[in-house]
Amino acid sequence: MEKYAVYVPRLIKKRENFSPGHRACIGCGEALALRLAFKALDNNVIVVNATGCMEIFTSQLPLSSWYLPWIHTLFENAAAVASGIEAGYKAMRRKGMPVPENTKVVAIGGDGATSDIGLQAISGALERGHDFTYICFDNEAYMNTGIQRSSATPFGAATTTSPAGKNSIGQFSWKKNMPEIAAAHNIPYVATACHSYPFDLMAKVKKAVDTKGPAYVHILSVCPTGWRSATDTVIRQGRLAVQTGMFPLYEVVNGQYKMSVDLPKLKPVKDYLKIQGRFRHLSDDIIRQIQDRVELEYQKLLEKAKNGIESKRTARKGK
């Protein structure tokens, strides 16, 4: 797949590393993103899966949706386990032991396992320079355990632990910017993606895994169950997230920012918010606050990409 053109579907391999027949909810954007991500890769991959939706709906014994070596970890230690696998292979090579050539290690987790519970292990693995890829499949709450808020839940969203009511607008804090946190570790590759832009997603995952050293990919994964939205609008919701600036698509390659989608003008965030039940309680004033915040953050991102503010930073290379 090294030379495939991401805009030519017929050149993509037919092989699937993630099978159908899993137990995801109807319209699950995470399952779609998962399939796309691993379809971009060959079969020389070891998958390290943090506890969460992906682990639950893909691996209930005696069944499995994985055609790859796969290990289930705790919520908090997927990056640590991935680090150990990578270091173990390195030690085996030093001792002259037989090791499969070009084996890749990919850790995956949801937004809770990434931005909250597993943040320390991820930060450590990125800082140490382990040669692995971490992919966050972000559905913006702890969906597996009952739609509880996480630090990746958007401002104003209603969840079971940030309910909307007379004295609450829902989520009270702004979404944690995990891609920027990853980029702050000066690693070679960081990217954002969404299943609604499938070939962009596949290209970025392939690029991340082929990068020498640590790489981080953050994928927005629409969750109709938790977002209280129609199951047939999953692709539309992902596109609107990008087109409104709520979830911009970009790469950070060796410190240099690059926008992935050219948007001459952002669509109003209301177009995105109004099709999700978790935002139906928001007043016009709160929506204006969200609009202002999105425009400010998007402009900052454009300036980084335009001026190469980050290009002078020296990215860490893999050990």
What spans do the regions from the language model cover?
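Cofactor-binding active-site loop characterized by glycine-rich and histidine/acidic residues
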Residues: 2-134, 147-157, 171
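Conserved thiamine diphosphate
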Residues: 9-13, 101, 151-207
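Electropositive phosphate-/nucleotide-binding environments in soluble metabolic enzymes
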Residues: 15, 27-31, 75-79, 172, ...
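Flexible, low-complexity linker and terminal segments
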Residues: 221-319
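Short, surface-exposed, charged loop/turn segments at secondary-structure junctions
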Residues: 148-155, 198, 205-212, 229-240
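Active-site lining segments that contact anionic ligands and/or coordinate catalytic metals
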Residues: 212-214, 247
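Short, conserved beta-strand edge motifs with alternating hydrophobic and charged residues
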Residues: 136, 191-193, 216-220
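Short gly/pro/ser/thr-enriched loop/turn and capping motifs at secondary-structure boundaries
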Residues: 54-55, 139-144, 224-226
